[in-house]
Amino acid sequence: MSPTPKTRSNFVESIVGLMPRLEFRRIKRAEDFAEVFRLRYRAYIANELIEPNQRGMSIDNYDLLENCQIFGLFLDGNLSSSLRIHRVTADTPWCPAIKSFGEYLKPELEEGNSFVDGSRFCVEPSRDPELSALPFLTVRFAYMASVHFAATYNLSVVRSEHAAFYRRYYGFERWAGGVRLDWYKIPVDLYVGDMRENRSRIDERLPFMQSNFEERLMLFTDELPDQGIKSVKGLFGNTATNSVRENSPGSNLREWLDSAVG
């Protein structure tokens, strides 16, 4: 049963009402990877954030790392947004944020803290303008991952005009900024959310961010797919899915990477 606060805003109610139409999918199949990389490209080109490339995809080396997981949010069966996460610990200290802001983040790893770095956020540029909930629901992947992996911090590297979203709704704080990435046209800032301080407030204010154990197990591990279970229901009627990994999706990714960096 979904959590039911005494009162909910119309905004929260609208998102909760949307949830049964949503599939939160762990991306593993070559055709799904290709669809996500094309969505990234469309979104970034539409916002003039990257240079065009012949392949029409946006992919980088971080997509190939062992601590990387890529997700797609499907509305009525159509890919509507995507997010990539890296689970970052002292044993797996690799993620885009570490490269750009290592002087701030590496000391935290040395102290035994951990991160979930959410990156390559993108939303279908041709979506219905009324679907203002998509950014919240896309960030939900990183939030669920932070809960599942008991991460100390949730990271997001964003351009300045998006910072208010993370500050207002998720309690993120700016740790550093004004950095230029080699593939991105606009300077970015590092925003960090302390899960120890923010989780209870987020759960209360944005109840649709919550998830059950089965949903997180489906998305962030292979335990259920290995048992032949490919989908489960979330707290609010949404579906979480995780397909069986193909034998060699990496060969496709490396081929695309050679012609579509950005």
State where each predicted segment sits.
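Short acidic N-proximal helix/loop "leader" segments that mark the beginning
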Residues: 1-19, 235-262
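Charged, low-complexity, helix/coiled-coil-prone segments
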Residues: 10-17, 75-93, 107-109, 212-229, ...
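Short amphipathic alpha-helix that is part of the acyltransferase structural core
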Residues: 11-60, 69-74, 79
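A generic fold-level signal
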Residues: 19, 65-66, 185
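A general structural signal for short secondary-structure junctions and capping/turn motifs
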Residues: 26, 61-63, 180-183
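Conserved donor-binding loop and adjoining core beta-sheet/short helix segment
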Residues: 53-110, 116-120
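Charge-rich, low-complexity intrinsically disordered segments
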Residues: 185-255
